[in-house]
A protein has these predicted regions:
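Detector for outer-membrane/organellar transmembrane beta-barrel domains
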Residues: 154-282
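Beta-barrel outer-membrane channel/assembly domains of diderm bacteria
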Residues: 2-111, 116-136, 145-156, 166, ...
Length: 334
């Protein structure tokens, strides 16, 4: 009996060790949308999405696979394999290789869509306080393209972070982030090698009492230059859906937004007011959004978002139209 108990204990410990470096995390959300336009037409839509992240680890090497399950997909599209990559160290170099996207917090992240590149590799190291790196992407046929080669650096200067990255024969990006006089500053410039194709983004935030105030803006030389469609800052983006600049809103070359956020009795309240700036011959399209979110005892978070937005691409002299959207979101992370 003792031998059986010892064997069982050993087996349990071995099993625990075997799975100790494998983890599964994720999140899920259910969304309801009620939209009414100027003509009085009302639509009701819903969406269910589950995201799962699998991570395996061996020493300094990790392997990540992220999956998205969407209720509205068919047999071919309901399951989307998103990020699939590994990270490791080779001497003093950090290596990330596979299919992965950049976030909106990355340099130029609020300007360019952080699309996934096939078989991308990112190699970086530190030289004192300076981080330098090289990033190489491939096309959908796994063919390495020179136009997808990027070098970058991040340098701390007097409490600020200065960043630069250059994509050969395409653009050079600059960014600074820091704080001055109680105001948090993030400013980024994309200088294109193509004439009249530069984009400036900046975001300023400060806290007054219990309220966080913000002002953010994007200023482009022309329409069609901004591809990010899932901003973490703006209530309305200069691009829609997916597809990068191919889905940029037509006749829009800028956006500005004022915001205020606070907490009231456990509810996080945010107000955003702004405007999509139109190109010559079109009307600017204003928008406002108020949202409230609260963590529930069940472990979920309930969010209610109301957005009133004018329609872009309405020519000067034409009657402006708008829409009102009520969104209810029930989300959980695990």
């Amino acid at each position: 009996m003792k031998k059986q108990m010892i064997a069982a204990a050993v087996a349990a410990s071995v099993s625990a060790v075997a799975v100790a470096d494998i983890s599964i995390t994720g999140n899920a959300n259910y969304e309801y949308f009620n939209t009414e336009n100027t003509a009085g037409v009302t639509t009701h839509t819903t969406d269910t999405e589950i995201n799962l992240s699998f991570k395996g680890k061996s020493g300094d090497t990790s392997v990540v696979a992220n999956l998205e399950i969407d209720s509205h997909g068919n047999a071919d599209t309901a399951l989307d394999i998103e990020d699939t990559y590994m990270t490791t160290k080779i001497g003093d170099f950090n290596v990330k290789a596979g299919n992965f996207a950049s976030s909106t917090s990355a340099l130029l992240g609020e300007i360019d869509a952080g699309g996934r590149s096939t078989s991308k590799v990112d190699i970086s190291t530190t030289l004192g306080d300076i981080k330098v790196g090289y990033n190489q992407g491939s096309n959908t046929s796994d063919i390495v393209e020179n136009s997808a080669s990027t070098v970058y650096a991040s340098i701390p200067v007097a409490g600020w972070t200065v960043q630069v990255k250059d994509q050969s024969d395409s653009y050079t990006g600059f960014g600074v982030a820091g704080s001055i006089g109680g105001v948090n500053v993030r400013a980024e410039q994309k200088n294109s090698d193509t004439a009249n194709s530069n984009v400036l983004f900046y975001n300023l935030t400060t806290k007054v009492g219990d309220v966080t105030l913000g002002y953010a803006a994007i200023d482009a030389d022309a329409s069609g230059l901004v591809g990010e469609e899932d901003s973490s800052i703006f209530a309305r983006e200069m691009a829609t859906g997916t597809g990068g600049t191919s889905n940029a809103r037509s006749d829009v070359d800028g956006v500005w937004q004022l915001s205020a956020a606070t907490a009231v009795d456990g509810n996080n309240i945010t107000l955003k007011v702004g405007e999509l700036r139109a190109t010559t011959g079109n009307q600017d399209a204003g928008f406002s959004q108020v949202s409230a979110s609260r963590k529930l005892a069940s472990g979920t978070t309930l969010s209610v978002i109301y957005t009133d937005a004018e329609t872009e691409s309405i020519t000067t002299g034409s009657t402006m139209t708008d829409s009102q959207t009520l969104e209810v979101d029930l989300a959980v992370s695990f």
